[in-house]
Amino acid sequence: MQAITSPFSESWGEYRLRKEDFSWHKANEGRLQGKWLRGLWSNELYQERRSSTTGRADDMMTVATLSLPPTLEIQKFVELFKLAYMHMRFVHPMLGVTIETNVFSIPLLPCFVYEQVTSFDEVQAWADRTVHVHTCESEQDRALSMSDRIQCVRNTVGTRPLPISQHTREWHIICFGREEDAHHVALMSYCAHSVSDARAELLLLQQLLDEMARLEGAWPVSASHPSHPAAHEWGSEIKRLTPSLMEMIGVPIDAFEEEAARELVRSVTSEPSLRLDEGRPIAEPELSETLHARVVFSKEETDALHQAAKAHGWSLTHLVDAARHMAYMQVRRPYLEAWHWSPIPEKLHTDFLIPMDARYAILETFRDGASGHVCNATEGFTTTIPLMDPYYIPIERELASSEKELHELSQVRTLAYMAQSLCLQYNAQKKQAKQRMMSSIPTLVLAGVFLPTYPFQSLSPEGFSSVGVVDRLLTTRIPLPGHTQPIDIIDWTVGLLMSKHRGSLQFSLHIWTFQEQLNLSVVHTPHITKERTALFLDTMRSTLKLFLMAYEQHGKPIDIPAAPPTPFKEPTLFQYVGRWLQSLLSH
């Protein structure tokens, strides 16, 4: 391995970085002269994985579906939303940043750009440019259900790249055409992942709706009204531009920990891991249509899963993540159980990435007070699970050959073993946030994220992501002054964009809780079939429900195996020959 040195050291040659490039500073020359700049680093750089060569495109697209009071016209809702959004730009100026490359010594190193506001007219033009209203233009549009209409707009918008040199966030207000949906709208946020995460989206949505209620209480709000965003001291918002997450949690920009970097590199390249599919699409990096599949547990089931997890010393996240690993194995079962003379190596998939909200670690100096940090504050870690640990015998196969209590079943015991293994890894990793931050700098450089050929592997990981969002962040009912009925948030979903390039995500799992109901959602490209996705989600759902039934029937916590309870048994020579003959006949 090449000797690891600090990316701020001169020995990096073309990779030499300047610390001052990563703090907000005013450009004194060049095409961005007079604008404020800051290089992206750490988690921001990881999320900003786009280029014309690699085709990475992991921008976020969240959707909140609202039920409006019958007395609130859609046109007025749009007007209130725009005013509230302009106010949020003053409170959180990061909403107004753009992203540029070819600015610093490394051409592909992206940087945030902010142009200080000199008049309210500029803010109004920005809002007009970034807030779009989608009305039903045809009979076909008007006949669509709310979910189908959202999916239609999502794929229309989501196959058009976000113009990040103009803005890094767009809002799309979706109207519906059926009579029963007349007083509903959907708020779709399309934004660069480097400037936001799922928790930030919820925080921002809550603040927007609260501000809309405040404006409605002061209505009519003219430009001279003190509640109007035109009354703000525009230009002073520059003081609230936020530094990188590393700085906010107290890690110096040029922090470096060589051994941690080496260990991180080893952990994501040496362990065998499953890949979802044997083949990958190889195409131009244009954005792909994405498909969405979802499982929603009832409030009672969600509460019971919480209680079952707690009884075993786990969180619900540990339990759900264990089911995720088992479902991932189930999708690959035919390959794992089949005999191959030359099996495809299973070492190219980076281990499961677990996002973590780092807002708890932000220093008091950088706290946004009650408003929360409405930017990307996600750091993460990987869990290392041996290739065959999630292997299990499905309940229908096991009960066909033996009689067992539910808590004795392979599927239940494997889930318990996996949850315990993940719990131990989670607890160990949570204490190492700053260490991971220090090691992520050289790791990102070693991974070649500054190279136009990144990712350089011929087979790149599909990648999994998860979002743990709790609904207490989002008030689902917002009273409106002057209206007898409130605005109700009746649904919320999170997704991301994908491209056809082999380096882009093809499949991503998201986990959240909304209105006390556990949601499991998969976003995938057509390359990953609907059947595979359905098998994945059905396995997660059935495994969790089976575990819950076993725990309730057993009446006490299930014994946690000390080792994988269902080791994979190699087929006998007779079985090998039989499968070989069967494969010949099938062709």
Language-model features, listed with the residues they occupy:
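Non-catalytic N-terminal regions of enzymes
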Residues: 1-239, 317-333, 481-587
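Hydrophobic "lid/gating" helix adjacent to the active-site nucleophile
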Residues: 85-100, 302-370, 551
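Flexible, P/S/T/G-rich "lid" or insertion loops adjacent to the active sites of thioester-utilizing
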Residues: 254-314
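Short beta-strand/turn segments that mark the catalytic/cofactor-handling region
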Residues: 2-12, 103-150, 154, 175, ...
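Secretion/export-associated helical scaffolds and adjacent low-complexity Pro/Gly/Ser/Thr-rich regions
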Residues: 220-274
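Hydrophobic alpha/beta scaffold of the E2-like acyltransferase core of 2-oxoacid dehydrogenase complexes
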Residues: 297, 320, 408, 419-421, ...
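A short, structured beta-strand-centered segment in the mid-to-C-terminal lobe
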Residues: 361-424
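Intrinsically disordered, low-complexity domain-flanking/linker segments in eukaryotic proteins
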Residues: 179-180, 334-347, 391-411, 481
